[in-house]
C-alpha cells in the first residue's frame, strides 16, 4: 500500500491550492486505475458521475470528475473523507490521480431517497427502521461535529446523500463535496432547498446547527414517507422563500410527544434553540428501546406477498394523518386534519396502552432533556404542565408491549397524535393554541397536506439578517448560476458581480411573477364570483320588475272593480228609490 499526497501530481497540485490549509497533507492510498473494472453508472454525487466497479475482488463505487469546475468539490470530499472513520460514514478506500477519481465503499441498498420515493415496487419498512435510520444519521453527524482539531459540518444532509447497506438496516452518510470545516467562513451556499436551514441561504454565517435542521426534516420524511414541501413545487427559491417566512412541514397526527418535540426543536428559526447532535443521539438512543426490529432486512412486496400481506407498496391499507399547522401568538390556530397515505408504516395491532405513572422500570420511564446540554439519564420525572421533559406515560402508548410468553411483540407507529405547537412554545401545554379538527370521510386523497407558515415569537435569526436572501440565486438552474470567477482578474470579478446582481434581479422578477400569477388566479376567482353575483342580481331585478308589473296590473284591476262596484250600488239605490 502506498501513501500519496494531494500535491504529488500536476492535477492534485492545482487542486491542492483550493484547500484552505496548504500545509495539510491528505493521506490516502493511491490506487492504480488499471486495477479498477468499471461495471455500470449508478448515478451522480456532489460532483461527477458515480459508477459501480470491481477492485481487488470487491464491489466499490468510484466518483470521477467530469470538468475542472468539479475539481474543488472533489478535493473537499477527498480531504474530508481522509479524515473520518465511522461506521455510519461511507468508507474511502483510496483515490486515483490519473484519471482523478475516488474509490469508495459501495452501498448495494442504494440511497434512502430511492427507498422512500423511488420506483415501484417500494420496500416495506417499519417505524423501527425509520427511527434507526435517523439515529444512525445523527450518530454519523455527531461524529463529524465532534472532530478535532476542526469539526466538520456536512451542509447537504438529505436522503439522496444517505446510503443503505446490509439489507437496508445500516445507514451511511456520503457526498462530502459540500462539507467544510466549522471554523471556515462560508461564502458559498450549497445544498438542497427542501432540507436547507434558513440561515444557510440567508447569508454566510451559519454553524453546525444547519445539519440539525436538515436532520429534523429527514425525521419527518421517513415517518411520513412524503417529500418535504412537495406541494409547493416550482423552482427551489419558492421553497426557500416559504422556509424563510416560517413554513415548516405539517405536524403528524398521534406522533409521540418526545419525537414531535425533538423534531420541532430542530426546525427552530433560531439555531441556538435547536438541540445539538449529541443531545439528539441521546434522545434517539433512548427512544429506540420502544422500536424493536430495526435489524431485520427490508422486505419488498414480492418477498412477503405469500405471507398474506399486501402485494403493492402503494396499498392504502394503513394511514398516517398529517395535521398542518400555522401557529401564531396573536391568534388561535386552526388546524386541518388531512389524511395522508403511508405505504410502509402499518397500524398497530391494537390500541397502544397508556403507561402507568408509577412504572419505574427501565423500559417504562423516559425523560427528555428540556435544555440542550442536559443529560437524559439525570432528568427528574415530569410534571403535568411540561412537554419538553416528558416520560413515556405522556406518549399514551406502550410501544414495546409484551405477549403472554414474555417476548416483545412487534409494533410500529399507529395513528400519531398531534398538537399545534410552536418550537418556541413546546415547554408548556397551556401555550398550545385552540384546535379545530375537520374529519374527512371516504377514500383518502393522495395529495400531500399543505404546509403553513410557522411564525415564532422572534422572526429574526441570531445573525440579525433581514428579509433579503442575498445568496439564494445559488439554487437557480445550473445554466442560470453565475460561473466562478478568476480571483486574479478584475474583469472576471466584475463580470461575476454583474451576473450575481442580474441573477438576483431575475429571482426577484420570478418571485413577483409567481405572486402576480397567484393574485391573478385570486382575481379570476373573484371575477367568476362577481359574474355569478351579477347574474343573480339581474335575475332578482327581473323578478322584482315582474312583481311590480303584476302589482300595477292588480292595482288597475282593483280600481276597475271598485268603480264597477260603485256603479252597481248606485243603480241599486235608484231602483229602490223608484220602487
Curated annotation (Swiss-Prot):
GO biological process: apoptotic process; I-kappaB phosphorylation; immune response; JNK cascade; positive regulation of canonical NF-kappaB signal transduction; positive regulation of JUN kinase activity
Keywords: Apoptosis, ATP-binding, Cell membrane, Cytoplasm, Isopeptide bond, Kinase, Magnesium, Membrane, Metal-binding, Nucleotide-binding, Phosphoprotein, Serine/threonine-protein kinase, Stress response, Transcription, Transcription regulation, Transferase, Ubl conjugation
Region (Disordered): 301-339, 354-391, 416-466
Modification Phosphoserine, positions: 192, 367, 389, 412, 428
Cross-referenced InterPro entries: Kinase-like_dom_sf, MAP3K7, Prot_kinase_dom, Protein_kinase_ATP_BS, Ser-Thr/Tyr_kinase_cat_dom, Ser/Thr_kinase_AS
Sequence positions bearing Phosphothreonine: 184, 187
Domain Protein kinase stretches: 36-291
UniProt activity-regulation remark: Activated by pro-inflammatory cytokines and in response to physical and chemical stresses, including osmotic stress, oxidative stress, arsenic and ultraviolet light irradiation. Activated by 'Lys-63'-linked polyubiquitination and by autophosphorylation. Association with TAB1/MAP3K7IP1 and TAB2/MAP3K7IP2 promotes activation through autophosphorylation, whereas PPM1B/PP2CB, PP2A and PPP6C dephosphorylation leads to inactivation. Ceramides are also able to activate MAP3K7/TAK1.
Catalytic activity line of the entry: L-seryl-[protein] + ATP = O-phospho-L-seryl-[protein] + ADP + H(+); L-threonyl-[protein] + ATP = O-phospho-L-threonyl-[protein] + ADP + H(+)
Enzyme Commission code(s) on record: 2.7.11.25
Feature: compositional bias, Polar residues: 306-322, 416-425
A cellular-component GO term for this protein: cytoplasm
Compartment(s) of residence: Cytoplasm; Cell membrane
SMART domains xrefs: S_TKc (SM00220)
Entry comment on modification after translation: Association with TAB1/MAP3K7IP1 promotes autophosphorylation at Ser-192 and subsequent activation. Association with TAB2/MAP3K7IP2, itself associated with free unanchored Lys-63 polyubiquitin chain, promotes autophosphorylation and subsequent activation of MAP3K7. Dephosphorylation at Ser-192 by PPM1B/PP2CB and at Thr-187 by PP2A and PPP6C leads to inactivation. 'Lys-48'-linked polyubiquitination at Lys-72 is induced by TNFalpha, and leads to proteasomal degradation. Undergoes 'Lys-48'-linked polyubiquitination catalyzed by ITCH. 'Lys-63'-linked polyubiquitination at Lys-158 by TRIM8 does not lead to proteasomal degradation but contributes to autophosphorylation and activation. Deubiquitinated by CYLD, a protease that selectively cleaves 'Lys-63'-linked ubiquitin chains. Deubiquitinated by USP19; leading to negative regulation of TNF-alpha- and IL-1beta-triggered NF-kappa-B activation.
Membrane topology (UniProt): Peripheral membrane protein
Cross-link (Glycyl lysine isopeptide (Lys-Gly) (interchain with G-Cter in ubiquitin)): 72, 158, 209
Cofactor: Mg(2+)
Keyword Membrane attached: yes
Active site (catalytic residues): 156 (proton acceptor)
Pfam families: PK_Tyr_Ser-Thr
Record-stated family: Belongs to the protein kinase superfamily. STE Ser/Thr protein kinase family. MAP kinase kinase kinase subfamily.
Protein name: Mitogen-activated protein kinase kinase kinase 7
Name of the coding gene: MAP3K7
